[in-house]
């Protein structure tokens, strides 16, 4: 995974409440045998018209928000089924962080496991951020994971993050990579443990 320390990029507001995983990644894009091309499916019914042409009214299709790496979202984002494809698609589309007041539990875990940071802030703070990024002149913000703050034209907002998830994101490690990073410690423990308890080794 890519490391996440300090990222400065465009942010797009998508403030609808209860955006579920079927909206994020419609079911017809779950049929592949690998993860390739899932970015095409992200918000498909919002991004494209029935004839397949881009919907010019959709925020991510508008020139001022194209290439956004952050989404400022409404409450309970990612509710619905637990399809991990939704997060894979967001990551392929270039989304590095989601900023909102609440996220569905399994979706939140899937995000952090796949290198997408979820940031929870208060109702007042999300309104402030959404207002800021709704203006093309101020829609570039910074997310400082090490300092745990969102930096906008109108000030900075602190956020909490699980220490373990933070370390994994900063180092760009998934669960397997994080475990392998402690290989020497694991082997040292194993050696000393079986030396002290030889009857346990088969």
UniProtKB/Swiss-Prot annotation:
Classification via InterPro entries: 3-IsopropMal_deHydase_ssu, Aconitase/3IPM_dehydase_swvl, AconitaseA/IPMdHydase_ssu_swvl, IPMI_Swivel, LeuD
Task: Give the GO cellular component terms, alphabetically.
Answer: 3-isopropylmalate dehydratase complex
- Involved pathway(s): Amino-acid biosynthesis; L-leucine biosynthesis; L-leucine from 3-methyl-2-oxobutanoate: step 2/4
List the catalysed reactions: (2R,3S)-3-isopropylmalate = (2S)-2-isopropylmalate
| Membrane-spanning intervals of the chain | none
Protein's GO biological process = L-leucine biosynthetic process
Q: Does Methyltransferase show up as a keyword for this record?
A: no
Q: What is its EC number?
A: 4.2.1.33
What keywords does the record list, in alphabetical order? Amino-acid biosynthesis, Branched-chain amino acid biosynthesis, Leucine biosynthesis, Lyase
Q: Does the keyword Lyase apply?
A: yes
Taxonomy, superkingdom:
Bacteria
- State the Gene Ontology terms under molecular function: 3-isopropylmalate dehydratase activity
Q: Which family does it belong to?
A: Belongs to the LeuD family. LeuD type 1 subfamily.
Q: What does this protein do?
A: Catalyzes the isomerization between 2-isopropylmalate and 3-isopropylmalate, via the formation of 2-isopropylmaleate.
Known NCBIfam families for this protein?
A: leuD, PRK01641.1
Q: How does it assemble?
A: Heterodimer of LeuC and LeuD.
This chain's protein is named: 3-isopropylmalate dehydratase small subunit 1
